[in-house]
Amino acid sequence: MTTFIFFGKYTMEGLKGMSAERTEDAIDVIEKCGGQVKEMYAVLGPYDLLFVLSFPSTEDAMKCSVFLARMTGIAFTTAPAVSVELFDQMMSET
């Protein structure tokens, strides 16, 4: 499974539907797309949400990002991520 960071930015539409129930619905969508939730944060700064998720493929992560945006009205930017330990190992091999 590959780790992906989903950066979420609330839209006006997305702000209207905020609820614990919608969070549970989002987790269901993530799992239906083959994903696993590692962490979910509300943050301050250029983004409002930060999700750390795992997916079997990039295609699954992309599909989930679009499904979540349609369902919630939240704009997501999605990026693959590796641990610092793996990054250090990769750099030692170059």
Segments predicted by a language model, with ranges:
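A compositional/biophysical signature of low hydrophobicity enriched in polar/charged and small residues
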Residues: M1-T94
